[in-house]
Amino acid sequence: MNFTRLGFVLAAVATVIAIVSAAYSQEKSSTNGSAHGIMRSADLKWTPIIKGCDLAALNGDSSAEGTPFVLRLRCTAGTKIPAHWHPTDENVTVLQGTFQVGMGEKFDAAKLETMSPGNFVSMPKEMRHYALSKTATIVQVNGLGPFKVNWVNPSEVVPPDAKPAK
C-alpha cells in the first residue's frame, strides 16, 4: 500500500467516525436523559467504515470526552477487522451471528475466541485486538468517549469502496 492510499484510509476512517458521531449528536434524541426513547432497528442509519462493516450510532456522542455512547457494528460473513486499539475501554455484546475476537498486535486466526449472541467482551483501553465476523454479525459497542480506532498496521485496512482483488 502506498502512502497516498494509507493516508486516505486513515482519513476516511477518522472522518466516518466523526460524521456518525456528529450526525447523531445533531439529531433530536428522546434518550437525552430527560425521557426514555425507543430506537427501532429498521430506523438505524448505517455508514460504511471498512470493507464489509457498517456503523450506526444509537445514543450519546462517541467523540465527546467522558460521554457515554452506544454504537452498533454490522459486518458481512468473513469480514476481518485488522488489529487495532482504542484510547478508552471498549465493551462489546454480540447481538446476532458468530463473532470471533483475538488479542494481539497481528491478526492470528489460531487465537480467535468465538462469541455467539448474548456473549460479552470488555477490552481495556489500548489493548490491541482484532476480530472476524464468522457469519453475518451485529455487535453493540458501548463505552465512554472519545472513541477512536487506532490501526496497528493501517495498510491492512480495506476501505469500504475497495474493489475485490483479482
Report residues per predicted region:
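Bacterial N-terminal signal peptides that target proteins for export
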Residues: 1-11
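Bacterial N-terminal signal peptides
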Residues: 9-19
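A short, N-terminal "cap"/entry segment at the start of jelly-roll beta-barrel domains
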Residues: 24-67, 156-166
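Double-stranded beta-helix
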Residues: 34-37, 110, 130-166
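Conserved short histidine dyad/triad with adjacent acidic residue
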Residues: 69-86, 114-115, 124-125
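Glycine- and acidic-residue-biased ligand/ion/polar-headgroup-sensing regions
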Residues: 76-79, 86-106
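Short beta-strand His + acidic residue motifs that chelate non-heme Fe in jelly-roll/DSBH
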Residues: 81-83, 101-102, 123-124, 128-134
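Short acidic-glycine-tyrosine-enriched beta hairpin
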Residues: 105-126
